Each structure stands twice: as C-alpha cells, then as structure tokens.
Amino acid sequence: MKIVISHGSGGIGTAETFARDFFESKGYEVHLIDYFTPHGIRNLAWGAGKYQDHHDCTFSEMFKVDFPEGDIIHIGFSLGAFLGIINHERFVHNYLFYPGCIAFTQSMLEKDYTNASVIVGTEDTGQNKYNAFKELLKHPPAMHYYLAGAHHAFMITDIDRQFDMVRYGIPKGVMDQQEFDELKPNHKYLSERYGHKTLRTILKSNNDYRMQYLTIIEEEIREHRTKF
C-alpha cells in the first residue's frame, strides 16, 4: 500500500510535506508527485494583472504522470485533487481536498467515484465548477465533508492572505474532449477564449482541521487495509 500526494497550484509546499511526514511517521511509503517541474513551472498565480500565468503545456499533458506500481491511496490538494479526478481509476481510494476543477468531459462523468472522499471548507468560494461536475455524476464520491468556517487551502501551514483570483468563463457543462485537451494555464489564451473576471479569494490555514482529517484518513486506511 502506497500513498501518493499531488500538490496544488503553489507546487510542493507545506500542505504536501506535512501530510507526507504524518503518514511516514505511521510507517507508510509516501510519494510526492511533482507535475510542474517537468514543464518548467514553479507555481500558478491565477492572476489577471501583474502576476499572469503564461505556460504553453496543457493540463492534460501535466496530468500524465508516472505513478508507482501497486495499490495507491491518493491525496490531492486543489489542482492536485483535479489531477486525482482525471486519474481516478488508478487509485483504490482518492481523497480530494478542496478540488480545483477546471472543466469536465463526458468520459469523466462516466467514472465510478464512489471510492473517493471530498473535503472542502464552507467558506471556499471556488467550488462552483466542482459542484456542477458532482451534480452530473452517476456515481459520485461516497463522502463529502463540509468543514464549517474553513477556507480554501486550509491544509497549508501559516497562510492567511487574500488576493483577486482570476475566474475564466469556462462553461460549467460538459466539454468536448478536444477542447478540454487544449486547456492550458495561460492567461492570455484562456481569457481570449472564455473571458474572465476576478473574485476576492481567501486562503487561510486551519491546523485543527488539518490534523483531524489526516487522522481520519489514516484510520480509514488502517481499518480497510485488507479490503484495499
């Protein structure tokens, strides 16, 4: 049994390394997946002003990663949770923290996500696209945890900031596979194709929830280890 952790838009940071250290202390083999560095990406800013993303690799290219062999428990944060949705069939269980869903296709809707759990804060303002995706699923995640008062990125250590996050007008309905495969973290491309607006976004740590839900995940893995 291996645990794989996928980072969010900030790259590998404290959310990922804290989770790694937690599970390694319990005796698990843990792998951090870095899907940015192979494409020359340090982080994604999701800004419309001075800090714009201008990368030419597509999300589909970024999310084609080499997972370790064997049974995998996946833990994804934000954009890493979206990577988890894309590669869901590879995992025996899939824990998705505040998923940063960009768009979805018919093939994504046809997957069975009942072996997934979603953990999101009630104050996270960026879940509209995931919620639209969830409502169309025939086999949605078995568990959805809604954490009272928690904001996006609550698993990160010592973060408390606000910024104007760009929101592109990508349709909330089913997207053609070819169009999906053309999506890339490039502000000029996405804005010209879909338009954009900005939304004040809060990123804020919650250490209590972090420990609580890492502990819950570890207990579930241990309890169902023979099943996995």
Regions inferred by a protein language model and the residue ranges of each:
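C-terminal catalytic histidine-bearing segment of alpha/beta-hydrolase fold enzymes
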Residues: P141-F228
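Serine-hydrolase catalytic machinery in alpha/beta-hydrolase-like enzymes
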Residues: K2-F67
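Short, hinge-like loop/turn segments at secondary-structure boundaries
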Residues: G47-Q52, D112, R161-D164
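Hydrophobic/aromatic beta-strand patches that form the interior of the parallel beta-sheet core
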Residues: V4, H31-D34, I73-I75, Y95, ...
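Glycine-rich His-Gly loop
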Residues: I5-G10, S78, P99, G121-T122
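Short aromatic-enriched loop/helix-cap "lid" or pocket-rim segments at secondary-structure transitions
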Residues: R42-A45, M108, Y130, M155-D160
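Primarily recognizes the serine-hydrolase "nucleophile elbow" in alpha/beta-hydrolase
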Residues: C57, M62-Y113
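The feature captures the conserved acid-bearing segment of alpha/beta-hydrolase catalytic domains
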Residues: H93-H152
